[in-house]
């Protein structure tokens, strides 16, 4: 699979979404008891959170990789857990990529799996984290030898604001069909991670992911706002900050959010003004319906 760069919708194939979700399920299933400490984040999340679309809503464009976030309990636990993860990955045909949190498999459709963890006092955002012997003197190995995780600013919310999604998956390599549950990061954590990403890199798909989630939520942006506000994490200060940042990023057609959305979706530059207005309108409806979080 050619790795898209997040610049334009043309680089993505929504028909691969189910196949990638099945690959993610296969990896999580292979991790055994550690699966309880792993949450699926990233581009597969919107389609899993909104599996049934209202009439006229286009499917999410999908993604080209699988992003897994390790819980704080796993990150700060026995370093031997990471060796087990690495061993399982190798057994599934993966090898370390250009950085130690990215693992690749070249056969079949080709897969990239990236590992993340919540940022914390000893795990600054944007840095690769790998416990050392001094951090965990009882561990026999140094984070499984090679495997590491990239710390994300969204923090612990990524693994506490979660949804357990039940789906039927057709596992790869003719392993059969299985009904199983995936732990998926919830909508508030997803929005928080995406607005952090939008502000920190030039990947227009981040804006698309934000708009698609609130616009495609069953019932539309206002219903999304009411639904998200019912989540326990809604009143956390970092969520309030993230939602304010989303409001600002889409406050006008020339703001970074609206421009990024239009750049990603437009097939003709003449369509960009209309797409900018669409993004501004969707987010305006969403934030207007959000109740006071104080």
Language-model features: where?
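Compositionally biased terminal segments of proteins
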Residues: 1-294
